[in-house]
């Protein structure tokens, strides 16, 4: 009885071995693929990563099947490619060869007029030779536009899977996203406080930004802050510093924001989220200096601007530039008594005079300054005949210089210009160009409708924001409305304009 059992067991074993031999050709490619993955895949991926890669390869048949979904659909990766197109490397190109179009197909700049694919590492020379023949120039532009797709390697995914068009467009068809991004930009700009740039009233009139429009936008921001959580609502309060809020509101409408990645650099920089342009505010007139000049010229030191008297004591956020850091240290050496005796208009004006003035009289050396009342070695050397130890509070020459520096020819006014929110963008930026909505793009339109007025992107966003506010405007009003506050700010702008023109 034992022999049949042993025979059956032998037959079963032979059948198993034969089945294994039969199935071995089917399992060999999978085994080889696993061995290859063990040498290429990172160790922290583990077994799950190998199984996922094997599954994607068995289904799609390509190891790069999931790469397009990770890089071409990433908005952060898209704008990181756009950021490589600096003005030195990519200049003088038409709109159809803008960095937004090049980054859509995976290109970055490595040298002047030299593109490189971020995936297949292919190179493309995009130089435009100066030509007097306009047709030849247009032909060259068309060739380069076509080469953005054809210059990739054979198995590169960018020609078949470019980034979405919406990355390089303003979301004009989605008002909720516009309002949310508008509030985020406003909150980030308010962190700069008095370091925000001063705006010229003529530029605001050119942009058709009236007091009523600014008031509606401030009401919209206040309503959106009320809908946010309490943690985010405490960061910004619209009850104080109305001049800062009006400036931040105008800049955020035009697409400017204070990037969070720049806070560690301790610099007052604002950036555009579309053209990735960064602007240092130390090169422009700032609210801090304008308020100081305004108070000194109109005698407003005894009656401060509403909203500033309740400000908590704050440390200076960041020095505007290395030059401002040195001038701040020079101001600390001067005593308040001497400054009051000399009737200085303000610390900002004195800093600018001591550093930027072309006259050698207005350039005191840092080691010559002392905490005590200053002497007059410079005026004595010019022939006044004073003794070195004689202490005088001021001199006629200094008074004359200070009166002249309050005019429009002062170094502070001439060296620092006003910030224009629209002209600081790059010429291909969607904020200053005519932007098509999603419906127009889906219909295949490349030009705006002739019946609709041609408006730049920031003005289209402004129209949508105002319409969104007017559609949901509440009936109740505050005791001191924001429109009244904004009119006070514009009155300050007009006074400052008359100050600069005197």
Swiss-Prot record:
Q: Which keywords does this Swiss-Prot/TrEMBL entry list?
A: Acetylation, Cell cycle, Cell division, Metal-binding, Mitosis, Nucleus, Phosphoprotein, Ubl conjugation pathway, Zinc, Zinc-finger
Q: Which GO terms describe its biological process?
A: cell division; protein ubiquitination
Q: Which residues carry this modification: N-acetylalanine?
A: 2
Keyword Cell cycle (UniProt):
yes
Region called Disordered, residue ranges = 36-73, 302-423
Major subcellular site: nucleus
What domain of life?
Answer: Eukaryota
Cellular location(s):
Nucleus; Nucleus envelope
- Stretch list, region F-box-like: 170-210
Q: Where is the composition biased (Polar residues)?
A: 52-72, 327-338, 351-360
Indicate what this protein is called per its UniProt record: Zinc finger C3HC-type protein 1
Q: What is the lineage of its organism?
A: Eukaryota, Metazoa, Chordata, Craniata, Vertebrata
């Amino acid at each position: 009885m034992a022999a049949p059992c042993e025979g059956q067991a032998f037959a079963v074993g032979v059948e198993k071995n034969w089945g294994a031999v039969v199935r071995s050709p089917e399992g060999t490619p999978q085994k080889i693929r696993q061995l290859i993955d063990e040498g290429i895949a990172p160790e922290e991926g583990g077994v799950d990563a190998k199984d996922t890669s094997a599954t994607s390869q068995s289904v799609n048949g390509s190891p790069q099947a999931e790469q397009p979904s990770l890089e071409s659909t990433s908005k952060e990766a898209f704008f990181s490619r756009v950021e490589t197109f600096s003005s030195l490397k990519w200049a003088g190109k038409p709109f159809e060869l803008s960095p937004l179009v090049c980054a859509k197909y995976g290109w970055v700049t490595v040298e002047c007029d030299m593109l490189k694919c971020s995936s297949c590492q292919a190179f493309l020379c995009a130089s435009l030779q100066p030509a007097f023949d306009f047709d030849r120039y247009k032909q060259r532009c068309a060739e380069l536009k076509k080469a953005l797709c054809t210059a990739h390697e054979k198995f590169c995914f960018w020609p078949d899977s470019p980034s979405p068009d919406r990355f390089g467009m303003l979301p004009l068809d989605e008002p909720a996203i516009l309002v949310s991004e508008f509030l985020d930009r406003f909150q980030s700009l308010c962190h700069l406080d008095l370091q925000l740039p001063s705006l010229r009233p003529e530029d605001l009139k050119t942009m058709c930004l009236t007091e009523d429009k600014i008031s509606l936008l401030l009401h919209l921001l206040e309503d959106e802050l009320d809908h946010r959580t309490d943690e985010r609502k405490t960061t910004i309060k619209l009850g104080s510093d109305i001049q800062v809020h009006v400036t931040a509101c105008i800049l955020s409408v035009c697409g400017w924001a204070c990037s969070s990645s720049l806070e560690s650099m301790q610099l007052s920089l604002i950036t555009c989220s579309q053209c990735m342009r960064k602007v240092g505010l130390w090169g422009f007139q700032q609210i801090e200096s304008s308020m100081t000049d305004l108070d000194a010229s109109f005698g407003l030191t005894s009656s401060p601007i509403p909203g500033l008297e309740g400000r908590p004591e704050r440390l200076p956020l960041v020095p505007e530039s290395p030059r401002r850091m040195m001038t701040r240290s020079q101001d600390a050496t001067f005593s308040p008594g001497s400054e009051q005796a000399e009737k200085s208009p303000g610390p900002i004006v004195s800093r600018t005079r001591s550093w930027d003035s072309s006259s050698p009289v207005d350039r005191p050396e840092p080691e010559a300054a002392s905490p005590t009342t200053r002497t007059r070695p410079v005026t004595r050397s010019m022939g006044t005949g004073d003794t070195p130890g004689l202490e005088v509070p001021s001199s006629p020459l200094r008074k004359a210089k200070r009166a002249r520096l309050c005019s429009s020819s002062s170094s502070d006014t001439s060296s620092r210009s006003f910030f224009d929110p629209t002209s600081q963008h790059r010429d291909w930026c969607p904020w200053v160009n005519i932007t098509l909505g999603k419906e127009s793009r889906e219909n295949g339109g490349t030009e705006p409708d002739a019946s609709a007025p041609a408006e730049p992107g920031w003005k289209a966003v402004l129209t949508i924001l105002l319409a969104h506010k007017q559609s949901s405007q509440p009936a109740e009003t505050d005791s001191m409305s924001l429109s009244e506050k904004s009119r006070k700010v514009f009155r300050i702008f007009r006074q400052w304009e008359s100050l600069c023109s005197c």
